[in-house]
Amino acid sequence: MGDSNLTDGSEGPFLKYALFCRGTAETEGGELTLNGIVDLLDLPEPEKSSASENPVLATVDYNLAFCIGGADPGEHYLFVTLKTPGIPLETPPAQKVEWEEGILFQRWIKTFRIPVQKPGIHAAAILFDGIPLGEATFLVRFSDDAKPLEST
């Protein structure tokens, strides 16, 4: 009970995994390595005067690595959007993807430049043909021990 079985005949697409990381590498054999998995970002407390000048505290470049399985062969639409505290971010258009017969899983790595405006949960929501499959998240918090990030 409670265990998921990838061969249980469940219908429809599902999110196998999704996470933020700093880098990726793939071998010739197709093995994927995720480097610097990000689940927490510590930032120094901003100065009170600078908060009103620029709402962006830091900008981070992270990879979103995710894998979808269980889709029927044919044309589909993949939609990934960032949800962050603060001013809403521009939403990218959906991406058309072709799912071929016999494919069990497809994985994607998308690079995002994320403007951090406030502490809290930063998420990437993943939708496939308009169906929410899940999300990857990381938490931003203020810490006295944090070193300032260089905005890029």
Regions found by a protein language model. Give the residues of each.
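Contiguous segments within soluble domain cores/interaction surfaces
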Residues: 2-128, 132-152
